[in-house]
Amino acid sequence: MSVTARIKQKSILKKKLKIDEIINLTGLSYGVSDENFRLIRDEIASHTLLYDETKPARGIELWMDNNDILLSLSLPTSPSEIKMYYDTIAKICNTLKIKKYLRDDEQVNIEDNDKFIKYDEEASIGALEDIKNKTGNAYQRFEIFGIFNPISIGQ
């Protein structure tokens, strides 16, 4: 389960932000995953991961689709990473002087980000409870990919 934001860079006359400029704007650590889902720090690719070095969780995926900026957050994740995701969206929107973006293909306003933080925190809790119910006493395990290492839940 994930949530995806699409930020449209509309202005014809303004210079468009590129991935490296977005990374610098966020102030976050970054890297890419190799074919074994290991993080290669300080690398930029078509899909780049943003994360907080002091509170690593699952990371925010950043990529471009033509001039659109896309950010994806995998759930479940930590409350601090959910907040960081919406703070990152707000930073980008404020830099572009826009108030609206697409959240899972629905147009929303950055002023509603606090509401979405709450939604995603509740969705994360729900997903963890669902995993717990599915694993129960059975010999079953779920893998959730973290920014540095996979996290195994279950037996």
Residue ranges and their predicted role:
Residues 1-155:
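Acidic (Asp/Glu-rich) sequence patches and key acidic residues
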